[in-house]
Amino acid sequence: MTVADPRLTDAPAHSRTSLLGRRRGGRPPRFPRAAAYVALTKPRIVELLLITTIPVMLFAAGGLPSGWLILTTFVGGALAAGCANTLNCYFDRDIDALMKRTENRPLVTGEVSPRQALVFATVLGIASTAIFVAFVNVLSAALALGAILLYVVGYTLLLKRRTSQNIVWGGVAGCMQVLIGWTAVRDSLDWAPFVLFGVIFLWTPPHYWPLSVRYREDYANAGVPMLPVVAKPTTVSRQIVLYTIAMVLCSLLLVPLGGAGVVYGAAALVLGIGFLVQTIGLHRRATRFEVETGGRDAGTLEQLKRISPMGVFHGSITYLTLLSAAVAVDPFVRVGWPF
């Protein structure tokens, strides 16, 4: 039997409502139960994943695919990501309760029971597979199912609590969306989607590690060995810079291996340099921080805030969004290279 969070069961009605509505800027949602189920899917992560899917479809088609194909791929991908994220919430509900960043997730507060979450995830997974098989193709369905298994089994169950490299290899699941977008159009794979797969794989550490620096104490209290928990800030920031350099170089490979034009190539170079400058700035701040603290430990949360890691976190989102836009636009304004 599921025991609901006492903040919900023992609090007055208005307190319970405010807790349920905290995710909506303090206002209670009109349909709190539906809002709780949506929260399980981590919609912001779903949005970020789908930002890469549709541009890849446009690039693969060399223009605009059918609206129906875009819609069914979008919905199928969103349902698959929602399934994986819900299962992640199910298996991580014990550590989510220990972290301030995640303590208001529905399985922690008792808004949704573990059994209800499992049923919900199963329905999402079945619906995703059915949509891909019926309206897209079997290869895309297999890749979507593979992404779910990689995220839930590979990342959540095997890696997250065991290694500081958890998000590096766990990030493979997030890379699958570009393969799904490509196969939805081509029903086959080529070098181009694997280049973009590599970009997102190398983008994942510079995206998640700054967030982990900001919430280092949360992860430490929950016993999750994120790299910022077990390593000094300079070690983390150095790794972020190295991954960013590799990511920028990988993004440029879409020109010779994927036939991308000048628009994409110029955007990839400019955006890459801009983001690299941000990560180098983070490393410099981390180095100063280590000198100030004498390198004794990673410091307190207030000290870590001086490194300003969230600027790089938000910068990574901007980078991926604009790079994806360049992927989408390139087929429509294809300008060939003079060599």
From Swiss-Prot:
Subcellular location: Cell membrane
Gene that encodes the chain: ctaB
Protein name: Protoheme IX farnesyltransferase
GO cellular component: plasma membrane
Similarity annotation: Belongs to the UbiA prenyltransferase family. Protoheme IX farnesyltransferase subfamily.
E.C. number(s) listed in UniProt: 2.5.1.141
Function: Converts heme B (protoheme IX) to heme O by substitution of the vinyl group on carbon 2 of heme B porphyrin ring with a hydroxyethyl farnesyl side group.
Gene3D superfamilies in UniProt: UbiA prenyltransferase (1.10.357.140)
UniProt-listed InterPro entries: Protohaem_IX_farnesylTrfase, UbiA_prenyltransferase, UbiA_prenylTrfase_CS, UbiA_sf
GO molecular function: protoheme IX farnesyltransferase activity
Keywords associated with the record: Cell membrane, Heme biosynthesis, Membrane, Transferase, Transmembrane, Transmembrane helix
Misc remark: Carbon 2 of the heme B porphyrin ring is defined according to the Fischer nomenclature.
